Amino acid sequence: MAKQKNNLIFFAILLLLATVIFFGITITTALDRNRREIAALRRAVEAVPQSSGITANIAATTEKSPVIPCSNARFFKYPASRGGTLRTAIASDTGSLNPVTGNEATASSIIALCTSTLGIRNFENPEKFEPLMAESWQVSADGKKIYVKLRKNILWQDFVDPYTNKYVASETVTAHDFVFYVDVVRNMQVNAGALRSYFQDLESIRAISDLELEVVWKNEYYRSLEMTLGLIPLPRHFYCPDNAPFDPLKFNDDHKRNNMIVGCGAYKLTERVRDRKFVLERFENYFGSRLNIAPALEKRILEIVKADNTRLQMLLANDLDMLGLSAEQWNRRGSKKPFSKSVLTTGQKASDQPLQPGETLRRVKYLANAYFYIGYNLRNELFADRRVRQALTMLCNRDKILREVYHNQGRVISGPFFYNSPYYDKSIKPLPYDPAKALELLKSAGWQDSDGDGILDKNGKKFVFTALQVSGNPVQEKLLSIFKEDLARAGIDMKISPLEWPVYISKLDKRDYEVCSLGWQLPFESDPYQVWHSSQALNGSNHIGFANPAADRIIEEIRRTFDTAKRIELCHRFQKILHEEQPYTFLIVPETLQALSGRLENVQCFPLGLNSECFYIAR
């Protein structure tokens, strides 16, 4: 039951992320994602990559990472007068803001602005880590033991206790706060099942002193440093006032405290109005100020606006400064003034593309760190033969889906890695839309219309199955309808079953389905183990039941390989296996489409998009 509950939580996050992107709603900017992804242990989604720069630290026990400076500081520019408010909109409110138990996407985006991690990736070269709360770190030769030295004088945000109304002044963050975080997550009575799974390979964590932390992992794993630097501290003095013992049940259900955030990050949550807005103000004692990486913007207001058209009208009325657009909005409205004619893309700066007369909104576009797919339950005999799966992909008109569903704002893909990373092998081209070749493959696998009723059959069994659809999701509805029509012309009957999220998740968890359509969010480099290793088919995220001994061996080798070039080669070999096996019909990596107010300065599109904390408002 515990494993099932953990998977329910995980799939809820998965579906939430998929639906956010399906509707074209951008809830965070790239820096917000930067923090969320690198905090892999906190978010229950995969985090950022390790690189040759990190490998150098792992190779020798005496070598240290850069000490004290954070080179991201060069991307922050401060006007003579700091201040101003960034106004954005999100689609829905959230429940708990507890950084351990709160697992909704909206909560994660807000928590990310208010807290910090030990390390952060370089904006320009996201495969490299920069010290954030950590001043330095050392890694043992086998990558298992990591020694972290914290920066001095990092402060918790002050707060008013929700029960006593007593003001609590800022306290110093120590290594013990990181240990407390891990202890809470690993407490089996805490509702942190999906998060807890990321700590299964953690041997120990201990505070050597207030500023020294030792983290030991059980196995040689290339992500051990990444996961360590993704740790956040947890304020014991907030959750256990007056040195009270930790109460896991109260921690889960303390609605007053879980409606607040006490962090040590760039912003402080100062107001929350249910179903209306969140207000965050710059934390003036943020340690990033000493590193020149503190935001210039004084305030951020996140308004809750459910209707996408209403959000667009607010942007046009100058009531919002930044908004994610759907592909339809981008094509239909974004091509006209006041939107810019030019489009800012990866590697470009707004200063190189000044707005023209009549343009007040800047358009930005870059590939999302996500992809969507159609998955086949391989336990079902219909999908056991890879020739059948290859045929199904060749019957899926993905170019039509890209054109009619995503309005040509995306790219058809052939594998599971982040498209703009070296781990994705671009030499492996997606299978073409080829109904004639598909019918040949189906015939070779024994499928033909023996009774003339228009439906393929084999050994008396008709080629009929049901695909699950998230109810109320127009993108899934459209793409599955296109797929259904493609299949029908080939003599395959695919029925579509719209289901509410809880039912959909339950069926995934029980493996009680034939075909599904979902999405995965990705970092530059992901560990395929959780989604693709055969050991994860029973209770893990390998819900389709993919089992391939050669793939398993490569996945296991990827985890043990610290050399980046070798790991890239292994990922390419793994992608080739998936391309041959076609357990998924890989669909689309969508474009992230955004519009920004022309009053925002210091806008630059990095490999993972925009870093909103670098922005300032022109005076």
Positions of PLM-derived features:
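Detector for C-terminal structural segments
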Residues: 18-28, 33, 37, 69-70, ...
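N-terminal lobe/hinge region of extracytoplasmic solute-binding protein
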Residues: 71-74, 84-141, 183, 262-264
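Ligand/substrate-recognition segments at binding pockets and active sites
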Residues: 88, 274-275, 293, 299, ...
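Gly/Pro-rich hinge or "lid" segments in bacterial periplasmic/extracellular proteins
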Residues: 116, 122-124, 229-295, 299-301, ...
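Aromatic- and charge-enriched surface segment that lines or borders ligand/interaction sites
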Residues: 135-190, 214, 311-314, 382
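Alpha-helical secondary-structure segments
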Residues: 174-177, 210, 214-216, 265-266, ...
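Surface-exposed binding/hinge segments that line
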Residues: 190-245, 268
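Ligand-site clamp/hinge motif
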Residues: 252-258, 285-348, 484, 493-495, ...
